[in-house]
Curated annotation (Swiss-Prot):
Molecular function via GO: intramolecular oxidoreductase activity, interconverting aldoses and ketoses; L-ribulose-5-phosphate 3-epimerase activity
Annotated EC: 5.1.3.22
Pathway, per record: Cofactor degradation; L-ascorbate degradation; D-xylulose 5-phosphate from L-ascorbate: step 3/4
Keyword line: Isomerase
Catalytic activity: L-ribulose 5-phosphate = L-xylulose 5-phosphate
Domain of life: Bacteria
Name this polypeptide is given: L-ribulose-5-phosphate 3-epimerase UlaE
Induction (free text): Induced by L-ascorbate. Repressed by UlaR.
SUPFAM superfamilies in UniProt: Xylose isomerase-like
UniProt record, GO biological process: L-ascorbic acid catabolic process
Length: 284
């Protein structure tokens, strides 16, 4: 059984696709999770959530209240398509508008943390100008988040600009704002040439949540747990010993699998077994 001090959540894209959040949260509860992380990616379908009506937003809040399963975080990867670092003024403006809408949405439905994708640009070539635009966009975004009391948290990425906690800390120091923090992915962190334990310790005062997935060098998605390079037990031990008490989120993309729930149960049991070995939870 999970300790009450260690919330364990599941990524929306691990569960069957669809727009009924009551069903999704009920399933997450059945599978033993404390929360679900919402995805707002670059697809028109998920981007349209930011334009939900008052009634649609209220339906999500009611589903949270009815099930007791929270939606405390949003993975905002839409900036791949509309990057804050774009050299196109119109694209940058659209990226900031997405950020504004995401912050307003979070404020309305009770989302506390918006995980940001650490790309200055994704589909274009990066340069000094794209990085400058990215910094400026982050500064404006954090000002909006501060007014709304919503935390923006940078993910450690599959991309050189933000592939370590050390690099993300540079942005945290530059912005110098309590509403900008870090949301590391231990899979992405492990896939690069990082001293993972040192990196986790360095970021501990800024880490608000942790993504849990396996990876291989150059392969950042859909690596089955146990088949990659991540030393989960050591990562969990380091975080525990460093005083981290926040949430862990199992990140998977099994929504199109033949039986998503079965895939999730398998991953949940595997992760909880490593948590138990690290002394974080009771052994099953």
């Amino acid at each position: 059984m999970l300790s009450k001090q260690i919330p364990l959540g599941i990524y929306e894209k691990a569960l069957p696709a669809g727009e009924c959040w009551l069903e999704r949260l009920r399933l997450a509860k059945t599978l033993g999770f404390d929360f679900v992380e919402m995805s707002v990616d670059e697809t028109d379908e998920r981007l349209s959530r930011l334009d939900w009506s008052r009634e649609q937003r209220l339906a999500l809040v009611n589903a949270i209240v009815e099930t007791g399963v929270r939606v405390p975080s949003m993975c905002l990867s839409a900036h791949r398509r509309f990057p804050l670092g774009s050299e196109d003024d119109a694209v940058r403006a659209q990226g900031l508008e997405i950020m504004r809408k995401a912050i307003q949405f979070a404020q309305d439905v009770g989302i506390r943390v918006i995980q940001l994708a650490g790309y200055d640009v994704y589909y274009q070539e990066a340069n000094n100008e794209t990085r400058r635009h990215f910094r400026d966009g982050l500064k404006e975004s954090v000002e909006m988040a501060s007014r709304a009391q919503v935390t923006l948290a940078m993910e450690i990425m599959d991309y050189p600009l933000m592939n370590s906690i050390s690099k993300a800390l540079g942005y945290a120091h530059y912005l110098n704002n309590p509403w900008f923090q870090l949301y590391p992915d231990i899979g992405n962190l492990s896939a690069w040439d990082n001293d993972v334990q040192m990196e986790l310790q360095a970021g501990i005062g800024h880490i608000v949540a942790v993504h849990v997935k396996d990876t291989k060098p150059g392969v950042f998605k859909n690596v089955p747990f146990g088949e990659g390079v991540v030393d989960f037990e050591r990562c969990f031990e380091t975080l525990k010993q460093s005083g981290y008490c926040g949430p862990y989120l199992i990140e998977m993309w099994s929504e199109t699998a033949e039986d998503p729930a079965a895939e999730v149960v398998k991953a949940r049991d595997w992760v909880k077994a490593r948590m138990a070995k690290a002394g974080m939870v009771e052994a099953a």
